[in-house]
Amino acid sequence: VQIALADGDGLGDSWAQVLKCLSEFQRLHMIGTGAKTSSVFFPASSEAPSPMPQASAKGAAPSKAVASSTRHAHSVIIQPTRPRQSTAGGGSREHAVAAVDLAAVDELNSATMLDKVDVVAIDRIFSQTEVLSPEAIVHFVRNLCAVSREELASPTDPQVYALQKLVEIAYYNMSRVRFVWARIWEVIGDFFTEVGQHANLNIANYAVDSLRQLSKKFLERGELQNFVFQREFLKPFVDLMGVATSLEMKELIITCLDNLVLTSARSIRSGWRPMFEVFSIAATDPAASVAEPGFHVRLTLTLTLTLT
């Protein structure tokens, strides 16, 4: 943590190891505090997920440090006991025992983590990315996307810690010089397009809604004449609408853009183009719940922009 805070500009692709550690710290922190894991909010089944907290925006209060006056002598156990394979009849019992062993190790590690790791310092790693050099922030974002990809790969226990941090990073760095921001968003935007196609629809929906929140914040900044940053920012919506097979996903994309039109129309410039592309795709969809709102919004926008 201290190396990341002091020498972030020089870490390069070594950010991968740092961010993997932070992801593991977060997992142990949730175990130690009894918090619900991501799998509760993003079940792989068709069951409705529990209400998920909104991704943190810039200016949100950081996590509180976990204070403790007691210091333990033991250190984190890096290699936990692994389940053993067996062909004997008692195999299932051995697996159950091994699972208990792993749970005990996690409990011990989480207690050590709560006692030794400064959670506020971890938050500063992300909030201070706005002062990283142009090259360093791109390295940071690429490696955070890679860690998020690993977290989301589990079919039974996906984690969204790194994905939530990507949303925060986008907020923190949105005020950078535009050509630097364009490099950052090229990486983040492509990753949101990827996660928006996740097999777990709950995760895919979360990614699209996070994209909506970021888009609203970005559009509020306005756009100078002859620039097309809004068009690039909203491009993931077009890409996702073109490949979406889920009716729910298509409806969500339409709803997100409709919301952006209602809240940010005065600030939109080059962003109109990807919006029209999405609504045009929707207008030809065989599902009425997608085609009708897509057609009506497109028609309304055409008439409004023609008359103004």
Language model feature labels by segment:
Residues 151-155, 197:
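Structured catalytic modules that directly regulate molecular switches in eukaryotic signaling
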Residues 198, 248-249, 270, 285:
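Eukaryote-biased feature marking scaffold/signaling PDZ-domain proteins and nuclear chromatin regulators
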Residues 10-29, 140-148, 179-195, 217-241, ...:
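HEAT/HEAT-like alpha-solenoid repeats
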Residues 9-11, 175, 204:
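Short, solvent-exposed secondary-structure capping/transition elements
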